[in-house]
Amino acid sequence: FPYTTLFRSLLAESMSKYMQDKFRFLGVRGATRTEIYKKYFPDARKTKTIDWDFVESCWNKEEREFQYVVVYYLKAMQKFLKREDISRLKYLIVTKSWWDTVDLLAKVVGSLVIRIEGYDQIMLEWSKDSNIWLKRVAILYQLSLKEKVDKQVLERILVNNLGDSEFFINKAIGWALRDYSKFNPEWVREFIEKNKNGMANLSIRE
């Protein structure tokens, strides 16, 4: 990817500050990245195979834009994920973790989980993990699934995380409920009424 020719120091500094200086950036704007993805990813889809060496190479680079390449590449290639790839996705979630990559990886994980029978149990396990990012993915993986949302699994995952003081967990709980309320508002109202004493104010406001 021709990122190194697009270095912009001032923009890179601004992007890094936005991410609380957790990562170094090259300074490639989102619109520019999107144009690059549009150029390269259609050919990648023709292979019908995920290039995990490419994923690893990009993920191991220091600059954050390369991790963005990975998550958008996997989003473009998600229908080619295999059941054993869940362990690879887990690795990406727990390394170089922050909301900017994790939230996109949640969608990729969701595309795999809904295809593989029994993988909802993995999400239940993740929802009780000590790693906050695995828990966040478990909470968010059913976003936008509408009638395909497994209400029982969603409820168990949310209940597993009630009482957590972590901002990113409580924010995710509210996000998941708000999203599902667009399709099933009555269920969401009942859930909040039943569990409001254990819910963070942030989750309810969200």
Specify the residue positions occupied by each region the protein language model found.
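Alpha-helical scaffold domains
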Residues: F1-E206
